[in-house]
């Protein structure tokens, strides 16, 4: 995540409001920080945060404008697996709470099946839709889904399609 190193967490989250000339409302910043579990870190600086916390600040910064569409391009790719699993669960909780559309780009078959209700697989250049999958999963999802036979079957199905796309290129 790209954060302003000289700015506090709250100042980083406030940035989109300033850029869009939206009247500053402290309550919106605090609400976004609370949503991502960082309400107590508003006065911290990025250098004082873990990688997962920095990612949460970036998510709060995106949420402060109350978007109807959230675009996320590999936001968890550089994180360790434990942090990634936690943020996956947090993202699902936010999605349910905010009721907004999330377009999530990932290179992880496992992450795509866990997070998605629908998966679009693209070909390499030029990018075209190569396959589409509807993910059948219980709602709300829980960590136990990752160890279920249904999850394993869907991961195998998506992996097989990925292997076919790779063989064609």
Descriptions of predicted regions:
Residues 4-26, 35:
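ABC-type ATPase nucleotide-binding domains, specifically the catalytic core motifs of the NBD
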Residues 22-41, 93:
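Conserved ABC ATPase "signature" region
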Residues 44-47, 65:
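Conserved signature/switch motifs of ABC ATPase nucleotide-binding domains
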Residues 59:
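Hydrophobic anchor residue at the start of the ABC signature
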Residues 70-73:
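Catalytic Walker B motif of ABC-type/P-loop ATPase nucleotide-binding domains
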Residues 84-98:
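Helical segment within the ABC ATPase nucleotide-binding domain
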Residues 100-105:
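Conserved H-loop
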């Amino acid at each position: 995540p790209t954060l302003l190193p000289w700015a506090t967490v709250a100042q980083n989250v406030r940035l989109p409001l300033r850029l869009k000339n939206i009247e500053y409302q402290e309550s919106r910043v605090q609400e976004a920080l609370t949503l991502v579990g960082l309400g107590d870190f508003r006065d911290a600086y990025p250098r004082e945060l873990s990688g997962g916390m920095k990612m949460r600040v970036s998510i709060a910064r995106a949420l402060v404008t109350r978007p109807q569409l959230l675009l996320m391009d590999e936001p968890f790719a550089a994180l360790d697996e434990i942090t990634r699993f936690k943020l996956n669960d947090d993202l699902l909780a936010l999605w349910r709470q905010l009721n907004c559309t999330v377009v999530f780009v990932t290179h992880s078959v496992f992450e795509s099946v866990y997070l998605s209700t629908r998966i679009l697989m693209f070909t390499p250049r030029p990018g075209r839709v190569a396959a589409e999958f509807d993910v059948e999963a219980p709602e709300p999802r829980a960590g136990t889904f990752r160890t279920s036979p249904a999850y394993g079957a869907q991961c195998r199905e998506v992996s097989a399609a990925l292997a076919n796309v790779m063989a064609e290129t």
